[in-house]
Structure formats: structure tokens, C-alpha cells
């Protein structure tokens, strides 16, 4: 019922070769290749893409460098610069109170701006960002601030101990709030 309320598909055949449901994308932590795939990448190194903002050819880059670029993140998430800033400022996405601020924000070009995190910390942020963004799309009448507050009120702030079942419970509670 929660998946239906949120408009998230639930695929009956999952597993190693099966399709991934929207419910799984919202509830399961993604790392490594599974995380890169949600952002449209199939490898973690030797990445060559055209920067979506500047048109510059980026070659032989590692995934953490590519996905730390604000121009790539806004393109891959569909968020505007302002929306990305708001999402990174949330406790849920950043992983701590006060959130993150984009580095080199004073630049006029998103291709020069970066998410100020590296390696495993960046991976954690990117995992929560993709789930937050997907959930935001499922709740189009909610602002980023409203979704952030609702997640916090449902106990959705994540830690090392957070399991997929905990994330499912948060989504069930969010579906209840939506129905009110």
C-alpha cells in the first residue's frame, strides 16, 4: 500500500538478473557499481564524458571526481543548482546537521563547482541524494524542506546501522503522512 501511495513500482522478479523496482531504489543502500549505475555509469575509472554545462570533454576520470562535479550531478539528478544546494543542505543527504555547501559556489559555472567530499563519504552522500531525489519526484507537492522534515520526523536520518527494513519503515510512514 505504501508503494502504491508513493507511486513506486514493486517488481515481482528481482535478484541478480531481474529488474530493479522503484521501491528497491528507494529503500536499498547502493555502493560501488550499483551506485554508479543509478547515475548512469557502468565503471568507476577511465570515464570519458562531455561536461553537460561547459561542453568540455572530460577523459580518463575516476567516478568520484566526475560525480563531485555539480554540472554532472545536476544533469544526472535533474535537480536545478538551487535544488541541489537545498538537498545537500539537508541532514538526510549530507549525513549531519547543517548540511554541505557546494565548494567554489562563487563561480558562475557549475562545471567549476564541486561537492566537497571524497571517497566513501561522497559515496554515502550520493546514495542518499539519489534516494532523496527519487522520493522528491514521487511527492511533487512537497518542497525539499518539507521532505527533509518529514524524513526526520519519521526517524529516517541514517547511520551505519540503518538497514533496508528501516528505510522501508520510513517510506511507510511517509506514505501515511501523504495520505493525511
PLM feature segments, named:
Residues 1-180:
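Hydrophobic/aromatic interaction determinants used to assemble and anchor large protein complexes
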Amino acid at each position: 500500500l505504501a508503494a502504491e501511495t508513493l507511486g513506486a513500482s514493486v517488481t515481482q522478479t528481482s535478484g541478480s538478473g531481474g529488474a530493479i523496482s522503484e521501491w528497491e531504489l528507494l529503500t536499498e543502500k547502493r555502493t560501488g557499481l550499483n551506485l554508479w549505475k543509478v547515475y548512469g555509469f557502468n565503471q568507476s575509472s577511465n570515464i570519458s564524458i562531455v561536461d553537460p554545462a561547459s561542453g568540455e570533454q572530460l577523459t580518463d576520470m575516476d567516478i568520484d571526481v566526475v560525480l563531485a562535479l555539480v554540472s554532472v550531478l545536476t544533469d544526472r539528478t535533474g535537480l536545478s543548482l538551487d535544488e541541489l544546494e537545498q538537498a545537500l543542505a539537508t541532514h538526510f543527504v549530507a549525513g549531519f546537521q547543517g548540511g554541505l555547501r557546494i565548494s567554489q559556489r562563487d563561480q558562475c559555472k557549475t562545471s567549476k563547482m564541486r561537492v566537497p567530499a571524497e571517497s566513501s563519504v561522497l559515496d554515502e552522500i550520493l546514495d542518499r541524494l539519489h534516494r532523496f531525489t527519487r522520493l522528491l519526484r514521487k511527492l511533487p507537492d512537497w518542497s525539499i524542506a518539507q521532505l527533509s522534515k518529514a524524513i526526520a520526523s519519521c526517524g529516517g536520518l541514517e547511520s551505519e546501522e540503518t538497514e533496508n527494513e528501516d528505510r522501508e519503515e520510513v517510506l511507510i510512514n511517509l506514505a501515511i503522512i501523504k495520505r493525511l
